[in-house]
């Protein structure tokens, strides 16, 4: 793929890049989306759980997302009973109104992850950069990762990547 003279190509395919980036692995995450019109949460709520930190995020129309399981597996089969019970029980402990919620969706996906669970920037060819391994932190760390990538493009180094402890692979 050629983006034209002077252009950069950024590869942000997640696990789709695994054939070119062998260190990537998938970490299974499961999510429960429920409709609970009797529950009123205004902000995402993080929960401490024995196996992994969970969260409940309110969405418009009385919908809530309970998620953030992390299972060391690249299995994309349907959600397990154990994880589903953990997600729904966590919601119920936050508000008893979740006991009458309707399950809208149970989903499973894999998070692209590197050995240290931190994202990395990788120069794969002249003017080509792979950005990957965002693990559980995708939407939270993506703006800083973009800033680090742009520093690398503009200055050929990234003080921000160093400050954040991000790997820069040349």
Give residue ranges: language-model regions.
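A conserved beta-strand/loop element that lines the FAD pocket in flavoprotein oxidoreductases
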Residues: 1
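Short hydrophobic core segments
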Residues: 5-15, 146
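Active-site substrate-recognition segment that forms the wall
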Residues: 12-125
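Generic beta-sheet signal
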Residues: 7-9, 64, 129
